[in-house]
Every structure is written in C-alpha cells, then in structure tokens.
Amino acid sequence: MGEDMRVVKVESKWPPIIVMVISQVAMGSVNALVKKALDVGVNHMIIGAYRIAISSFILAPIAYILEREIIPEITFRLMVDHFISGLLGASLMQFFYLLGLSYTSATVACALVSLMPAITFAFALILRTEKIKSLRTQAGMIKVMGTIICISGALFLTFYKGPHISNSHSHQEALPHNNNSDHNTKNWLLGCLYLTIGTVLISLWILFQGTLSIKYPCKFSSTCLMSIFAAFQCALLSLYKSRDVKDWIIDDRFVIGVIVYAGVIGQAMSTVSVTWGVKKLGAVFVSAIMPIALISASLFDFIILHTPLYLGSLIGSVGTITGLYVFLWGKNKDMEA
C-alpha cells in the first residue's frame, strides 16, 4: 500500500515537470524572437502592452469556465494587490527587461534571470525571513557560495563581451564594428543593468505572489486580473519613448506574429505554468528548471535566427548556471535538515 502511494506521488509530479520544461523551452524562443522584433525599432512597451493584453484576452474565458464557481469576493484590497502584482511582475519588469533585451541578447537576458533565486535569497536576508544564524551551517555556507558564483558569472558576462562566435549564416549587421565599439560597449553595460533591475523586480514579484496566492488561490483569474492592470500600465509607460498614436499601428507581419506568440505562450501560458509549478513542485524545483530557457534561447538565437554569440556571454552563462545549482543544492540540504 505504501509503495503504491509512493508510485502515485512520483507519477503525479511528472505532468508539472513536463509542462515546466516545455514552458521554459518556449520562453527561450520567445526571448529570441522578441529581441528580433525589438531590432526592427518597435517601442518596447508597445510590444509589452499588446503582449499582456493578448494574455488577458486568452485567460479571461479560461478563468470564467474553470473558476467561475470558486472565485473569492474581489475586495478593494485584492484589487490593489493585483495592481501591485501587475506592476512588479509585468509592466515595470517588462519596461526594464525588454529595454535591456534590446541592448543585449536573448542569451544574456535568460542568463541574468537565472540570478533570481540568489537575489530572492539576498532579499530574504535583508527582510529577515532568512535567519543569519543559518548561514553558519553547511547548507547556509553552500547557499552563500552559490550566490557568489552566480553574481560572479553575471558580472563576467556584463563586463566581458569577448569575441563573437558566428556560424556561416550569421547576419553581418549583427556583428560588431570597430568604429562604434565604445557605443556598443556602453549599450551592452546599460542593457545588463536594465536586465538586472528586471530580474530584481521578478524576485520581488515572486515574494509578493506567495502572499497573494494564499489570499486569492485562483491562478487563471488572478493572472488575468494582473494582466488587465499591467496592460494599462504598459500603455502609460510607453509614453516614455513615444507619444505618437501611429506607433501603435504595427504592419510588420513578423512583429505581429511575435507579439501574438509572446502573448499566448510567453505571458499567459508561461505565467500560469510557473504558478502551477511552484504550487505542485515548490519554488526550488521550478528554479532548477528555469536554465532550460537559457539553453533554448542560445540554440534558437544561433541556429535558427543566425545571431552571433559572444564568448563572454557563454562563459558568464555557464558560471551563472553553476552558481544557481550550487545554491539550489544548499537550499535542498537546508530543507532536509
């Protein structure tokens, strides 16, 4: 009887694992495609607004069908919480993340997102939810070591771009030119800074979402409500770059396709799958799967979009992922203690 229960428990974990893996592979392709769309010159927050609006349209009927009988009463406090959730996890995060992506690459963007567990750990120390005393244990020391390796990898890919690695089909316009190398370096550093700010906002969103999901456990309607607020927030943030209404009229078929794909897969399905994954597998396990997006983005960038990669990005990404898994190893030992 006990053995049967263990088999059922193991088998019940496979669906969320498979969904998370597929989700992260898709996220890697989303980042690579959005980067290509940004290179066309579209306002990054207009892409963000359309992407999130599509997400809310997709999720609204799903939420109504699956959750209409269990949705809790929506109070003013819950509305404010979803407004903040939209700000941290969607609009403000995308403002910095997409701006950073436009200056760097999908590989760098996914690598810096791998810093998320380490940043969350640092916030936990600052907010005293992680006890300082626990740092003296073996698990605590491993977590600190993993955090340091993570940050070192991120710093390496930020400050060392290195020579490009291209294949025979790499686009020549994407390759660096000596006459504007200083400008490229400045943009690269700015891009990494913006991506780091975006990752910090995602970390804060995850901490905030942990509390919100207890008060409002309906994942589809919660994500939909968050997306509605975030779409309006993105529209306001788009004024930072342009106030011309014509910029909202997109006639490039590739960009339209990317926005739809990013809205359905990268925003709606990805947010729901991560929320479900955290609930079923735990935040640590979900964090361990997230580097798959980095591998997916790199392969999609290099093989399909023929974008050159940089040595610094590859070495820094390996360092960041190594640090992530060292950190997760320490976290696992901490949970077992």
Curated annotation (Swiss-Prot):
The chain crosses the membrane at residues 14-34, 46-66, 83-103, 107-127, 139-159, 188-208, 220-240, 254-274, 284-304, 309-329. Pfam families: EamA. GO terms for cellular component: membrane. The keyword Transmembrane applies. It is a multi-pass membrane protein. InterPro entries: EamA_dom, WAT1-related. It is found in: Membrane. Keywords: Membrane, Repeat, Transmembrane, Transmembrane helix. The keyword Transmembrane applies. Residues 27-157, 220-328 form the EamA domain. GO terms for molecular function: transmembrane transporter activity. PANTHER family: WAT1-RELATED PROTEIN. Belongs to the drug/metabolite transporter (DMT) superfamily. Plant drug/metabolite exporter (P-DME) (TC 2.A.7.4) family. This is WAT1-related protein At1g11460. It comes from Arabidopsis thaliana (Mouse-ear cress). The lineage of its organism: Eukaryota, Viridiplantae, Streptophyta, Embryophyta, Tracheophyta.
